[in-house]
């Protein structure tokens, strides 16, 4: 009997924390709040895992921690630099075929947020 399959995408939405990011004096002086959204395309997977064991799937706790660690590792001047570094790191996870990431500076301006989005790999 054939097992049913579907395309699986792991999504983390609205992950908020402070990071050292930016070129403005106040950005260099203190961390600022950012928000990260990430989608990881895992490709065709069984509709249900072969068993109920976390060791046989991509653990979203690990993905969350990688995002936080990469974004907090060091001061980065540009959103473009940070998102490229993060997307590259997420693409290295086992089974990941494609990555979509968005990083937003939440308080850079009084009247809006500023964000950048990148997509890499297979979609």
Regions found by a protein language model. Name each.
Residues 1-123:
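N-terminal, polar/charged subdomain of small-to-medium soluble alpha/beta proteins
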């Amino acid at each position: 009997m054939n097992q049913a399959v579907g395309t699986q995408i792991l999504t983390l939405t609205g992950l908020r924390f402070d990071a050292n990011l930016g070129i403005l004096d106040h950005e260099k002086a203190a961390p600022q709040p950012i928000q990260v959204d990430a989608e990881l395309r895992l490709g065709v997977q069984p509709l249900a895992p072969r068993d109920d064991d976390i060791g046989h799937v991509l653990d979203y706790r690990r993905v969350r921690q990688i995002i936080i660690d990469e974004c907090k590792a060091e001061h980065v001047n540009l959103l473009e630099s940070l998102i490229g570094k993060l997307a590259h790191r997420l693409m290295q996870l086992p089974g990941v075929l494609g990555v979509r990431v968005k990083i937003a500076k939440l308080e850079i301006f009084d009247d809006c947020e500023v964000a950048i989005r990148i997509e890499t790999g297979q979609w």
